[in-house]
């Protein structure tokens, strides 16, 4: 019963980005540069990652 997980890392600063993109990064649980979180791979999380793909790095 292990759900598939992905690791998301913030690799670019949110300074100068849209407010909604900053909120999405916070919604993913990322707080500072090079901060990594492990999230369950759901369509909602995938959509958030796609929205801010230019700010984050994703590992399976």
Swiss-Prot record:
Signal peptide (UniProt feature, chain positions): none
A GO biological process this protein is involved in?
A: translation
What keywords would UniProt list here?
Answer: Ribonucleoprotein, Ribosomal protein
What PROSITE patterns does the record tag this protein with? RIBOSOMAL_L30
Name of protein: Large ribosomal subunit protein uL30
What do we know about how this protein assembles, alone or with others? Part of the 50S ribosomal subunit.
Molecular function (GO) terms listed?
Answer: structural constituent of ribosome
What InterPro entries does its record include?
Ribo_uL30_ferredoxin-like_sf, Ribosomal_uL30_bac-type, Ribosomal_uL30_CS, Ribosomal_uL30_ferredoxin-like
* Family stated for the protein in its record: Belongs to the universal ribosomal protein uL30 family.
Any one GO CC term of this protein is: cytosolic large ribosomal subunit
Pfam families (alphabetical)? Ribosomal_L30 (PF00327)
Under NCBIfam families, the record lists: rpmD_bact
